[in-house]
Amino acid sequence: MKNIKKIFVVLLLLQIEALFGQAITQTTSTAKYQEEDCNIYLIYNDSLVPGDAIFVRMMIQTPKTHKKDKPLEKQATLQLYRKSKTKPIESGVFYSTGKSKKATNQEMLCGIPLSSFLEKDDYYLLITVKEGNDSVKEINLPLTFQARKFNSETIPLDSTNTAIKTDNSSARAAQIEKLNEILATVNADAVNALKPMASPTTSTRYTSWFGDRRVYAYSNGKSSTSLHYGNDYGIPEGSEVKACSDGKVVLAEWRNSTGWSIVIEHLPGLYSLYYHLSEMLVKEGDTVKTGDLIAKSGKTGLATGPHLHWEMRLNMSAVRPEFFLTNFTFEGINYY
């Protein structure tokens, strides 16, 4: 691919307070590519922070002189590579934001999760733009790695919670399979929300954090290790739980390990999860808006006390929830 012009500018600085007072500075960059048959503009967060995500928003402008024998609509994929490897670490497919006002403009968005176990190295993004099955454009975008530390904790379980944690029943297996099928669903039409999300509770009392490396100490003397996929808020039973963003309820039911549980779809492949509830106030199929009351907190399922577990999943992988409290889709930013 021939680049006539390529511009990178630091557009936005976000100071994010991480665990243990660790300050993470996330930068956002823009780029422009001028081609013979189209102009490509994009914006993305260029800081690779373990446990967060990378989102790329892209506008493809096709001139009015576009040849009719070539497809107007383009498809694109996003891949994360480690420079020392030949296979991508993560990948995703761009989907329409529904914001394009001109027929010759096509705006797309894609997000990919970043494992909390990513190690310091040289990484880059590869965007592949296709026009039908013929022409392919490849765009390489640089990334800057920023380390993040995660907490470690040991959680002693009584006999009741030990039984829940070690439950190998077919019922629990079916519940896990059902949830995984939902989280693996990427519905390109599910563009329900592009604005920054909001916390599901007004409380700021965290009892556990996303990415905690856990050891569960069983009542029988045995133990197991686990990774904590969300944030736990230590709030009294019956506290209000609100939708973090606009979306559709795709699960609202009892699960052996997470108690009364709700899952909401916000974007293609992006879901919020709410666990250990005492009461559910929505049902599967309901549409919700940011701040809608959806449940009351509790201590159902595997819980050592009353709390709300809030979790975010992108393409099945857990992502640090606070990432989505920022303008992660770059909504309202003029980048083209």
Predicted regions: what is each one?
Residues M1, M58-M59, M108, M197, ...:
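Detector for methionine-enriched segments
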Residues I24-R205, W209:
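Non-catalytic extracellular/periplasmic "stalk"
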Residues V9-L11, A174-K178, S226, G305:
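Generic secretory/membrane-interface signal
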Residues V9-V10, V49, V56, V93, ...:
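Extended aliphatic helical segments
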Residues M1-T27:
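Bacterial Sec-dependent N-terminal signal peptides
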Residues K5, I24-Q26, Q34, I40-Y44, ...:
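Residue-level detector of functional hotspots within protein domains
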Residues S199-Y336:
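Catalytic cores of peptidoglycan-degrading enzymes
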